[in-house]
C-alpha cells in the first residue's frame, strides 16, 4: 500500500512539473531575455526525470521485476526516455528546439499515464511465463528507447516540413502579387520611397536567413536523433529474436507486433539511405520520417488495441 501511494504521488508530481516546465519554456521562446525562467524550465524537466526514475524504481521494488511488462509501464519508461533526450542539449549548454519536442512528448505520455485509460494496468501483477526472462529488460528497454528517439527525430522532421511548406506558400503568393503589380503603377511609389524598399528588403533577407538556419538545425538534429533511435531499435529487434527463440522455439513468427516492428525498421532504414544522397536530404528525408512517425504509433498503440498475437499480453481494452 505504501509503494502504491508513493507511486501515485510521484506520477502526479512528475506530470505537474513537466506541465509547468513546458509552459515556462514556451514563454522563454518568445522572450529570450528571461534567463531565470529558462533555467527554471530546465530544472523542472530534471525534477520530472527524477520523479519518473523514482516511479520506475518503486515499481521495480514491489513488483520484483523490471517495470516493462505492459503498456502502462512502457509509457512510464517512454516518458523517462524523452526526459533523457531532453537533457542532452541542456548538458551541452545549447539552446535547441529539440527540447520543445521532448518536453511536449513527455507531457503527452505522462498525461496518458495519469489518465484513467490504463487504470487496469497500474496494479502490478505476476509476470506471465513468457516474460520471466532476463531478456525482458534488454529487449523492451531498447525498443522503447528506440521509439522515443525515433519519435523525437520524426517530430523535428515534421517541424521542418511545416516551416518549408509555409515558406513555399509565401513565395508562391509573392510571385502572384508581383505579376499583378507588374501591370500597375506601383513602381512609381517605389521610386519615390527608395529607403523603405531597402529596409524592407533587408528585413526579408534577414528573416529568410534565420529561417534557413532553423531548417538546417532541425534537419541536423532530426538526423542525429533518428540515427541513434535506429541503433536502439536494431538492438531491440535482434535481442527480441534471440529471446523469441528461447521462449517459442523460433526467431521470427510474423505476428502483428513483429511485422510492424519490421516495417518501422525498414522505413527508417530508407530514411537513413536518403540521407546519403544529397538530392534527397532535408525535405524528402523529412517526408520519410513523417511516414515513420505514423508507423511507430501503429506499432506501439495500434497493435496493442488489437490484442492478438504472441505479444497480446501487453494489450489493453478501452472501456
Swiss-Prot record:
Alphabetical UniProt keywords: Chloroplast, Cytochrome c-type biogenesis, Membrane, Plastid, Thylakoid, Transmembrane, Transmembrane helix
Gene Ontology annotations of biological process type: cytochrome complex assembly
GO molecular function per UniProt: heme binding
GO cellular component: chloroplast thylakoid membrane; plasma membrane
Transmembrane segments: 9-29, 44-64, 71-91, 143-163, 225-245, 259-273, 286-306
Main location class: plastid
Pfam families tied to this protein: Cytochrom_C_asm (PF01578)
Topology term for the membrane: Multi-pass membrane protein
Keyword Chloroplast found: yes
Localization per Swiss-Prot or TrEMBL: Plastid, Chloroplast thylakoid membrane
Subunit structure and binding partners: May interact with Ccs1.
HAMAP family linked to this entry: CytC_CcsA
NCBIfam families the UniProt entry points to: cytochr_II_ccsB
Family: Belongs to the CcmF/CycK/Ccl1/NrfE/CcsA family.
Function of the protein: Required during biogenesis of c-type cytochromes (cytochrome c6 and cytochrome f) at the step of heme attachment.
Designated name of the protein: Cytochrome c biogenesis protein CcsA
Species this protein is from: Oenothera parviflora (Small-flowered evening primrose)
Amino acid at each position: 500500500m505504501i509503494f502504491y501511494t508513493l507511486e501515485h504521488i510521484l506520477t502526479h508530481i512528475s506530470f505537474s512539473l513537466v506541465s509547468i516546465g513546458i509552459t515556462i519554456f514556451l514563454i522563454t521562446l518568445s522572450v529570450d531575455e528571461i534567463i531565470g525562467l529558462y533555467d527554471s524550465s530546465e530544472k523542472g524537466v530534471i525534477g520530472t526525470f527524477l520523479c519518473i526514475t523514482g516511479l520506475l524504481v518503486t515499481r521495480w521494488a514491489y513488483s520484483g521485476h523490471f517495470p516493462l511488462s505492459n503498456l502502462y509501464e512502457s509509457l512510464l519508461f517512454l516518458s523517462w526516455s524523452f526526459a533523457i533526450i531532453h537533457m542532452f542539449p541542456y548538458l551541452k549548454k545549447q539552446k535547441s528546439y529539440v527540447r520543445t519536442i521532448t518536453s511536449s512528448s513527455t507531457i503527452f505520455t505522462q498525461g496518458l499515464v495519469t489518465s484513467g485509460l490504463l487504470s487496469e494496468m497500474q496494479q502490478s501483477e505476476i509476470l506471465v511465463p513468457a516474460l520471466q526472462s532476463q531478456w525482458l529488460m534488454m529487449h523492451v528497454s531498447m525498443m522503447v528507447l528506440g521509439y522515443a528517439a525515433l519519435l523525437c527525430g520524426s517530430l523535428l522532421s515534421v517541424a521542418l516540413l511545416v516551416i518549408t511548406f509555409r515558406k513555399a506558400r509565401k513565395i508562391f503568393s509573392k510571385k502572384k502579387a508581383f505579376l499583378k503589380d507588374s501591370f500597375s503603377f506601383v513602381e512609381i511609389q517605389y521610386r519615390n520611397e527608395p529607403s523603405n524598399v531597402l529596409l524592407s528588403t533587408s528585413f526579408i533577407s534577414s528573416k529568410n536567413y534565420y529561417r534557413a538556419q532553423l531548417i538546417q538545425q532541425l534537419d541536423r538534429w532530426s538526423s542525429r536523433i533518428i540515427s541513434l533511435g535506429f541503433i536502439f531499435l536494431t538492438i531491440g529487434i535482434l535481442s527480441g529474436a534471440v529471446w523469441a527463440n528461447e521462449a517459442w522455439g523460433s526467431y521470427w513468427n510474423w505476428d502483428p507486433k513483429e511485422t510492424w516492428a519490421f516495417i518501422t525498421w525498414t522505413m527508417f532504414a530508407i530514411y537513413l539511405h536518403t540521407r546519403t544522397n544529397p538530392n534527397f536530404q532535408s525535405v524528402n528525408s523529412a517526408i520519410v520520417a513523417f511516414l515513420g512517425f505514423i508507423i511507430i504509433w501503429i506499432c506501439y498503440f495500434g497493435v496493442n488495441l488489437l490484442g492478438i498475437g504472441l505479444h497480446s499480453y501487453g494489450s489493453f481494452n478501452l472501456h
